[in-house]
Amino acid sequence: MKNVLVGQSGGPTAVINSSLAGVYETAKACGAPHVYGMQYGIEGVLEGKLVDLDTVLGDKMDIELLKRTPSSFLGSCRHKLPDPAVDEKPFLQLFELFKQYDIGAVFYIGGNDSMDTISKLSAYGKTVNSEIRFIGVPKTIDNDLMLTDHTPGYGSAAKYIATILKEVICDSSVYDLRSVTVAEIMGRHTGWLAAAASLAAGPDCNGPDLILLPERPFDEEAFLARVAELEKERHNVIIAVSEGVKNKDGVFLCDLVSTAGQLDAFGHKAILSGTSRYLADLIRVRLGCKTRAIEFSTLQRCASHLASRTDVTEAYQVGGAAVEAAVRGETAKMAAIKRLSNQPYRVETEMVDVTQVANFEKTVPDEWITADGMHVNEKFERYARPLIQAELTPIYINGVPRHIHL
């Protein structure tokens, strides 16, 4: 096996570094002389920023710390490669660098846009008769990648969201006062993360009263009527909402607070924020309730201290599966997770066509959403509950979790 190049792209997760560990250890086991890391993704490679991971991952303790370190160890980017037919320069530059470092396989850990990068690199490689293998490794807390049962990163984010919301529910019940709490959860176009709030429910907690997802347009009057009903029934009403919920006119609720915000290279609004504040103000003004808005923000994507062991394990497995696929000669593929059963929960990895993943989004199935569009049902529970099981204990130093950094 020739040398290997691996990068991380897009938003970080609590387990993206476990996938990096899977790529690194499997590549070394398969005989790769060097495993190079892209510093700051494909953008960093274009600037010649590579690191030999053998120099920074010296022993088993480093690997164990890597699995427990949140965010992207190598750094990330949101750089969109152009169509090579329009601008071939970056491709010429990249393939010259691949030749210089004797790269035989490139692995990119990321979401939809990262799979677009793998798709373009593999297609260009074919046109220039390159033997380099290009494989995608799935990563996103949004859980919106096609052709995989679920995406590494989601289980840990879901576990964090359910746990924190459960604690918010406890906190909201402290005083003998009626109130409505609105918790804003990430999710630009899909509601997988907000739906995870339902996992707070159990024998000691009822979970959130309402969950609003981008999959259903927001009906203001129906929403207010339901909140009014709930407010009469109980002291504290808890609402979970995706940041990307839109009204019937297709306008983000957060844009009704502010229209400010830049777009990233892929045409996405860089920051969605304000949905919970909009709803809290709406309820306060229209219903006269005491309200509070909470944004989980970036905390939900990097809480490695509360990571799902299932998620950590599967993240490592898809990294290893990607390398094994490259060794077999596969390219233009993504390592995916296939669910075999729920009881007991069992999965296996498989390789899927990356072109069928890039630039597509998987939404929460309509049949998993309640008829009124303001909650999820037991079908979601059966799907998501296995993904948050078990814990990976942090390695502590001075009373706080220890991490590893470049």
Where are each of the predicted segments found?
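Short glycine/serine/threonine-rich phosphate/pyrophosphate-binding segments
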Residues: T13-V23, V45-L46, K89-L92, N112-K120, ...
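Glycine-rich oxoanion-binding loops at beta->alpha junctions
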Residues: G48-G104, D113, P152-Y154, K166
